[in-house]
Curated annotation (Swiss-Prot):
Induction behaviour: By nitrate.
GO-annotated biological processes: nitrate assimilation
Gene: NIR
Disulfide bonds: none
Top-level lineage group: Eukaryota
A Gene Ontology cellular-component term: chloroplast
Entry keywords, A to Z: 4Fe-4S, Chloroplast, Electron transport, Heme, Iron, Iron-sulfur, Metal-binding, Nitrate assimilation, Oxidoreductase, Plastid, Transit peptide, Transport
The protein, known as: Ferredoxin--nitrite reductase, chloroplastic
């Protein structure tokens, strides 16, 4: 199947074929993960009558910044109050970060205003103060559309964390992104300049902003891709940050907002857990996308994305993104933070009314109905990308490397950059499973690449089968919201389970330190969500709620609770039991006896 070429962003037609003309609506039923919620999401296509007053925008533009109107400020959450006191983007637009960086942490803590700058507003610049566990240190999150980065960028990030010694490291995130750790405030202005010099930005990557646009990690090199997602994710990112200058029209959202563009039958991009997912589809011979909306995880509620009953052409990818963000900005809840994601707004308005609000914000105030000609083959078997695989370009291959729970040190990043230069084209690609792909490797160089010490000793293209699908959030080592330590524990538990049972196929296991579910446990075959519990002696200890049954792909499904509040020290036999009973694992002792 031919794909849309990278240099042809907006095709007038396409020869791509749909796998069938089935009804393309997903099942609107949703799996709740903590508390029961309104059934509105299940009947979203049936809109209640909406009072005209409810559709009055709650924000207005003042001096270039979008602010909440006075009449809508009753009952707002603390984050909204911080935004009203001073727009966080002023730290960037008016270079407030330079003045802030001259203050000691002691000086910062003397003023509520400065503390709010450090602990809240800096998140608009991608800086997260780790006050609880690493006082005075920051995590910095970037924008990396489609997960594509370069050896030069990787070296620069390595140079930043290297100076921080044991406090410095980097993580690959579940949105194909980099997070670097150990940053101190006085260094921030120079780091921001350094990012700009290598074509990177951290702008608008935290809090109530559009998060990193996810795309196919094999975009442009996959022999079976539907469309090259890189042009679209790049356009979305450029719009969101106004080419790294700051797009003030969408920096005061009610809550974060996650987009993705689907380019493969494999659905590597996980469309069902995004606020907006672009699903490839043709209509009247023209290439475009059907839209799914509202997928999200939170402490209170988890929902799969549902159809908007809308199709846009390739040239309307950014306009519909803009229209939806403006509708969310104008009408979304700003009270309880657990009820501020976009799906709550869809619930209240009903899908048709929400769709109408998006439509009237389109350039021509027209939003076409969904196409029946979806291009994703629903019976497609998801392919493995770890290891060596041929590209669509003759004589070239890509090599997928396993990065254990996504954690890297400076010297390892430098080595990866060197390897990308020596064996590939200087490009690296990050995946939502926290791994890295080296594309454009000449086939004649494959053997030499596989013999590199880094691949032999650390980042294997052929990891143990249970390690392949292992994902873990930051955990309590660095994150103040995490209840338990995750990364080291995920590796340790998996290693111990591997000694007990033998499995014949990968099993995706995800760890998250708290109910915010940054580790996306609900999409895993087996998921672990951190909690506090009690051991056999009644003493408090770290534990995990165990989820089972998450599915990805066209038959997506959010997992269900299997067992609550299991002490972490007791997880190994529980996991082994699940693997034997539900995934065909065999106890090692029986395997050896046979």
């Amino acid at each position: 199947m031919a794909s849309l070429p990278v240099n042809k962003i907006i095709p007038s037609s396409t020869t791509l074929l749909s796998s069938s003309n089935n009804n393309r609506r997903r099942n609107n039923s949703s799996i709740r993960c903590q508390k029961a919620v309104s059934p509105a999401a299940e009947t979203a296509a049936v809109s209640p009558s909406v009072d005209a007053a409810r559709l009055e925008p709650r924000v207005e533009e003042r001096d270039g910044f979008w602010v909440l109107k006075e009449e809508f400020r009753s009952g707002i959450n603390p984050a909204e109050k911080v935004k009203i006191e001073k727009d966080p983007m002023k730290l960037f637009i008016e270079d407030g970060i330079s003045d802030l960086a001259t203050l000691s942490m002691e000086e910062v803590d003397k003023s509520k205003h400065n503390k709010d700058d450090i602990d809240v507003r800096l998140k608009w610049l991608g800086l997260f103060h780790r006050r609880k566990h690493h006082y005075g240190r920051f995590m910095m999150r970037l924008k990396l559309p489609n997960g594509v980065t370069t050896s030069e960028q990787t070296r620069y990030l390595a140079s930043v964390i290297k100076k921080y010694g044991k406090d410095g490291c980097a993580d690959v995130t579940t949105r194909q992104n980099w997070q670097i750790r150990g940053v101190v405030l006085p260094d921030v202005p120079e780091i921001i300049k350094g990012l700009e010099s290598v074509g990177l930005t951290s702008l608008q990557s935290g809090m109530d902003n559009v998060r990193n646009p996810v795309g196919n990690p094999l975009a442009g090199i996959d022999p079976h891709e539907i469309v090259d997602t890189r042009p679209f994710t790049n356009l979305i990112s450029q719009f969101v940050t106004a080419n790294s200058r700051g797009n003030l029209s969408i920096t005061n959202l009610p809550r974060k907002w996650n987009p993705c563009v689907i380019g493969s039958h494999d659905l590597y991009e996980h469309p069902h857990i995004n606020d907006l997912a672009y699903m490839p589809a043709t209509k009247n011979g023209k290439f475009g996308f059907n839209l799914l909306v509202g997928g999200f995880f939170s402490i209170k509620r988890c929902e799969e994305a549902i159809p908007l009953d809308a199709w846009v052409s390739a040239e309307d990818v950014v306009p519909v993104c803009k229209a939806m963000l403006e509708a969310f900005r104008d009408l979304g809840f700003r009270g309880n933070r657990q009820k501020c994601r976009m799906m709550w707004l869809i619930d209240e308005l009903g899908m048709e009314a929400f769709r109408g609000e998006v439509e009237k914000r389109m350039p021509e105030q027209v939003l076409e109905r969904a196409s029946s000609e979806e291009l994703v083959q629903k019976d497609w078997e998801r392919r493995e990308y770890l290891g060596v695989h041929p590209q669509k370009q003759q004589g070239l291959s890509f090599v997928g490397l396993h990065i254990p729970v996504g954690r890297l040190q400076a010297d390892e990043m430098e080595e990866l950059a060197r390897i990308a230069d020596v064996y590939g084209s200087g490009e690296l690609r990050l995946t939502v499973e926290q791994n890295i792909i080296i594309p454009n490797v000449e086939n004649s160089k494959i053997d030499s690449l596989l013999n590199e010490p880094l691949l032999k000793e650390r980042y294997s293209p052929e990891p143990p089968i249970l390690m392949k699908g292992l994902v873990a959030c930051t955990g309590s080592q660095f994150c103040g919201q995490a209840i338990i330590e995750t990364k080291a524990r995920a590796l340790k538990v998996t290693e111990e389970v591997q000694r007990l049972v033998s499995v014949t196929r990968p099993v995706r296991m995800h760890w998250t330190g708290c109910p915010n579910s940054c580790g996306q446990v609900q999409v895993a075959d087996i998921g672990f969500m951190g909690c506090m519990t009690r051991d056999e002696n009644g003493k408090p200890c770290e534990g995990a709620d165990v989820f089972v049954g998450g599915r990805i792909g066209s038959d997506s499904h959010l997992g269900d609770i299997y067992k609550k509040a299991v002490p972490c020290k007791d997880l190994v036999p529980v996991v082994a039991e699940i693997l034997i009973n539900q995934f065909g694992a065999v106890p090692r002792e029986r395997e050896e006896a046979e």
